């Protein structure tokens, strides 16, 4: 499994709608509201062979209310 995180910037007033849509899609293992340049931090696990860029583009960025994302790929958990 590949672990990665996506920081998500939402349209104004849409953070909770986006978080709910992510939860309903059952694609993220964790979803957190955060402070800073982005509104949500979501943790994902992808099976080997899944292209993370395609996954984010097709499954995450298509959720209404998302205006920007930043993907962080994790190497090892300690």
Name what the model sees in each region.
Residues 1-78:
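A compositional/biophysical signature of low hydrophobicity enriched in polar/charged and small residues
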